[in-house]
């Protein structure tokens, strides 16, 4: 029996979903093709048999030829066409028409619909599923409408995005995404959820549908006011998510939907979302961990006398352990002796105190039988003789060492090291002391650099567990460096990368196949010193093959934005020398007149004529892309940046001027100003007369 949770809003016919209000009121001015006013084409009506609907919705945008043409279809959203679509024998009237799709795309859409209806049969009882509108690694998004609203016209029918999770998705992943949308969704540009349906191992989310533009279709056509509105709404959504101490972890243009005509925004896809502890809880937790570690060290020091260091056990001790455990065979003694010579790869737990019941080699606790006790009493004289022989042998070995120390005092440090290695079992050169704390092992200096083997210090270190989830190209340096204590600054870096792509008109800006190349790309832009300092602050070590100076973000954005101008052959010819060569900067690998370095010594081509962004935009970009996550600006602080606040004040002033700019109000203002000036002149005359009278009185 399917577990089904339905909202009353869906169950009630005729009720309609109201789109969530954005953080910023929408404006009436809508830009098409970079500017101007929006004009819709005249409405046309025709009937197209068996046409698959391709619309934008929450999730990954459609790929292939369907994805390329769908942007054009939405660009003329006013010219919607009515059609008849047939799915599984059911005809749906009045859906918006789109260009024809290929046979392969149609087959994939039908396969996705059949898979959804097969795995969750109750979906077909409530919804008419029309087409696949997006797919990802862990889910597929389909377009659906309510069956009970099939009699309504297209303008009154509600559309839903049905996200079908693949059966192999982990339940925790589905639960986290459901919790995020339930707690945070439906406001502040964050996607909400209507209901969740489950059948056996399959689950589906029913979410509001929002038609949107593809990022690659509009990011080069946005002007400064539209860029400001886009980034403001993105930061509004991130601020709302971060209030719940949640990291989205997958902020990118395809997950931040934007309807350019209606100026609507929506942050979707919380499949990688992660809850983090607030800063106060993290600091208290770390303090508690330090206190617990200190208590453990104190207990270890107090129980040193009661513990039995395994690395100092001799052959006689190994035999004694075997006898205590009831294992007196020669085979067991040989096996124990071989195990005592093995080197541990990782630190193990401390040995239990002596007051605990004695354990056998296999770890079992039991009482010694009487026969074993009798054998122990018989073997005690033999054991004493063996111990005396071992002491005599050790004294004989120490005598020549003392003589050599007197003859060669310079070799004393080397002999001290030899004594330390001799104290380990079987004379091994590795330190096998298992009571070394984990902190000491992690802080130990590595000695295996540029060697063909791995040192024990590296083997004794704890494994680093750091989340690396996210889309390549949008992951910050702390994720690439595997820093375990990651915060919501991860999403702020991704927002900065989106801002950089818009300002430079380069999408995607970072594109690396692995983490090492991704770090190299960041080093190329921000320099090696910033990465080294950040790695040191995060207690990470990074090795770079060469040094690199940082680049100027303003030069970078304008050079890319007007790449056709600065890469013109005529411009290059004007800077060439007599022999036809042109000097190239060694750091940024650009011609000297196009040098992008922050501290460039070259006389570069002026950029003031091509400037299109205010200085506050570059300052905000620099703070969003701060390498050190502890110094990076938050979403709430970014919304208070002058790039947004100065524009809001200017807009408010313009609105006040427009409100007070009617002819009647202007005439009233001129009349009031004239009366004020006339009154002020009369007051001046009266004051002058009073001053003259006062002067005459003083003379008398």
UniProtKB/Swiss-Prot annotation:
Induction (free text) = Post-transcriptionally regulated by 20-hydroxyecdysone (20E)-induced let-7 miRNA.
Which InterPro entries does this entry report, sorted A to Z?
Answer: Kinase-like_dom_sf (IPR011009), Prot_kinase_dom (IPR000719), Protein_kinase_ATP_BS (IPR017441), Ser/Thr_kinase_AS (IPR008271)
Q: Please list which residues make up the signal peptide.
A: none
Q: List the disulfide bonds.
A: none
Q: How is its activity regulated?
A: Activated by chif. Inhibited by the synthetic compound XL413.
Keywords from the named record: ATP-binding, Developmental protein, DNA replication, Kinase, Nucleotide-binding, Serine/threonine-protein kinase, Transferase
Q: Which GO terms describe its biological process?
A: eggshell chorion gene amplification; embryonic development via the syncytial blastoderm; endomitotic cell cycle; mitotic DNA damage checkpoint signaling; positive regulation of DNA replication
Checking Pfam families in the record gives: Pkinase
Q: Does the keyword Plastid apply?
A: no
Per the UniProt record, which EC number(s) apply here?
2.7.11.1
Q: Which residues form the active site?
A: 250
Which SMART domains does this entry report, sorted A to Z? S_TKc (SM00220)
Keyword Nucleotide-binding set for record = yes
Effect of a null allele: Lethal.
Query: Record-annotated residues binding ATP?
Result: 133-141, 163
Family, per entry: Belongs to the protein kinase superfamily. Ser/Thr protein kinase family.
Q: What does this protein do?
A: Catalytic component of the Dbf4-dependent kinase (DDK) complex. Phosphorylates components of the pre-replication complex, including Mcm2 and, to a lesser extent, Mcm4. Phosphorylates histones, including H3 and H2B. Required for DNA replication and mitotic proliferation, including during the endoreplication and amplification stages of DNA replication in egg chamber follicle cells of the ovary.
The subunit structure is:
Component of the Dbf4-dependent kinase (DDK) complex consisting of Cdc7 and the Dbf4 ortholog chif. Interacts with chif (via the processed polypeptide Chiffon-A); the interaction is direct.
- Protein name per UniProt: non-specific serine/threonine protein kinase Cdc7
